[in-house]
Amino acid sequence: MVQTSSQSTVNKIEMRLRGKGRGSIVFQQDYADCGTPSAVKSTFHRMYTDGMLVRLAHGIYYYPKADKEYGLGIIYPSVEDIAQAIAKRDKAKIVPMGAYALNRLGLSTQMPMNVVFLTNGAPRRIKIGNGRGILFKHSSSGKNFAYKSELMMLVVTAMRTIGEEKITDEERNVLVEHAKNVNDNDFNHDIKLAPAWVRKILIVR
């Protein structure tokens, strides 16, 4: 039996999805070689309506993984997972900013509706539903992306977000404790990238 063009497109996309495995974030444009633009678009739309894929944002889908241990249904990716997948696809680096950096370190219980990342890639805003979004702000400063330790990067970002004049003793203590978990080689490299007032606080870790 001869396959139609649309059937061939479906088979190619399904095979690639199975190869990536459940729990993967996928981009429709990465499957452009599987068929004509209309065939690829209709295949993704059909997979979404059939429940095979979850649509996270325009052109961005999730090949869902279920929680088999507790039966809690689909394990959805975090905003961080989505942002990192976009950065990886674009071959860009990203740095969490503002309220999200504070949330990551336990300094705030509020999860911002719009999570902000600095990027050395293209600036853009991704709408991910329910009023939430991911905002990528372009930065040409190499310092922002030169950290060896992600934790150290978060600590410095959080301190800069709070500000030298507004940081409390409690916040200072929490951040110093986080910095203690950075290995010495990374710390000695990364501390040089921080503002002078941040260095004075963290150097006593």
PLM features per residue range, with description:
Residues 2-85:
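Short beta-edge/loop segments at beta->alpha junctions of small alpha/beta modules
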Residues 28, 114, 170-171:
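Short coil/turn segments at secondary-structure boundaries
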Residues 40, 97-98, 151:
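Amphipathic alpha-helical interface surfaces
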Residues 56-59, 92-128, 133:
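Short gly/ser-rich loop at a beta-strand->alpha-helix junction or flexible surface loop bordering the NTP-binding
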Residues 82-84, 133-140:
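Short amphipathic alpha-helical segments and their helix-coil junctions
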Residues 84-86, 97-100, 157, 161-165:
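Positively charged, aromatic-accented nucleic-acid-binding surfaces
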Residues 89:
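Basic nucleic-acid-binding interfaces
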Residues 138-205:
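Hydrophobic alpha-helical interaction segments
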